[in-house]
Regions:
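Outer-membrane beta-barrel pore domains and translocons
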Residues: 1, 50-52, 107-109, 142, ...
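Residues on the lipid-exposed face of transmembrane beta-strands in outer-membrane beta-barrel proteins
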Residues: 34-38, 91-95, 104, 137-141, ...
Length: 171
């Protein structure tokens, strides 16, 4: 996975989160993609082309750990005219020097986090997927037996606006 922290995976955005199998967000759904990687002395360079988008899963009416009201996945919609066939793209560069590991990544395409709106019946929620651009940085520094970790992202989402987020930790 992308990222270094264990408590929150801010920058891990290629594969969609599976909230049915793992309400804590640890499990991911597979993602059809084309991945091109190039490795040299300046680091690992990766390009991802994502021709199809998998919607986030939510527990249904009979599912465990469901919210109220229930999310009706059959009513999902997209701001992109191509729906879930929008061609998303991502780039990642990772490298290390001595005790420092880092990675920079960028994703442009369908936002992995839908905005939930009440359906017309008022008893269920409708997931709406906008378009997003996200730039991320992850850093891990080793000091003796300690690992210091950080993830930072800047995101612009059609539905959720602009925001920054970060998480730090240690092992």
């Amino acid at each position: 996975f992308w990222g270094v922290t264990e408590s929150q995976h801010l920058v891990d955005v290629i594969n969609q989160t599976d909230l049915v199998e793992s309400p804590d967000g640890e499990d991911k759904l597979g993602q059809p993609m084309i991945n091109i990687a190039y490795v040299n002395e300046f680091g690992n360079f990766e390009i991802f082309l994502l021709p199809y988008f998998r919607e986030r899963t939510f527990s249904g009416i009979d599912g465990r750990f469901r919210g109220s009201p229930v999310v009706n996945m059959e009513t999902a919609s997209y701001l992109s005219g191509n729906g879930n066939n929008h061609l998303d793209a991502a780039f990642r560069w990772s490298h290390y020097m001595d005790e420092l590991d880092w990675a920079l990544s960028y994703l442009e395409g369908t936002d992995r986090e839908p905005r939930l709106y009440k359906n017309a019946d008022g008893t269920t929620l409708k997931p709406v997927y906008g378009q997003a651009r996200q730039a991320s940085l992850e850093i891990q520094y080793t000091i003796s037996d300690w690992l210091l970790k950080a993830e930072v992202l800047s995101k612009h989402s059609d539905l959720n606006g602009n925001y920054w987020a970060s998480v730090t930790g240690f092992e």
